Amino acid sequence: MPTLRPLPQAPQPAIDSTAATLRAKGQAADPQKFAVEVRPSTIDGQGVFALEAIAARRKIGEIRGEAVSTAEAFKRARAAEKSTGRVFMVAVSHARSVDATHTTDPLRFANHSCAPNMVLKVQQGRVAFHALRDIAVGEELTVAYGPTHHAGRLACRCGAPGCMGTL
C-alpha cells in the first residue's frame, strides 16, 4: 500500500498594506475576519449583522475605499445626502478620509449606536473594526460615529439607553 503524504501548501500571497488598499497578487484581498451579512436594520436603512459569535477585542474586518482629502470627503458627503441620503466616509486623519461609497465591504453598512459593540481603528491607513465586547450571532454590528458632517442636525435612532439624541 502506498504511503499517503499531504499535498504541499501553496505559498501565501503577499499583502501590500499601503494606504487603504489590500492587494494579493493584483487582486483585492478579503478584509473580513468574521462572517457578516447586510440586511434591513431597525436603526437605519441597511445594517451589518454577525453570522457567527465574535469574541471581545477581536478584529472583525476592514473597509476599503478611495483616499480623498477631508475637504473632498465633506463635499461628497453633502452631495450624497442631497441625492441618495447615504454617506460612506471615514476620516483617517485630520487631512485624509476614505470614501467607501463604491466598495463591496459589508462593514461600510455599520450603523451608529451611542452604545456600540465595535470600535473603529485606523492603523497605517487601514480602517479596521474591532469588537468592544462579545457579540452574539444575529446581533447588529454598530460603531459610535463620533463627530460627523451632520453637526448635531440628524436625529439618532439607535435606541440605546442614554442615547445622545443627535449625530
In which residue ranges do the predicted regions lie?
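Catalytic cores of histone-lysine modification enzymes
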Residues: 8-11, 16, 23-118
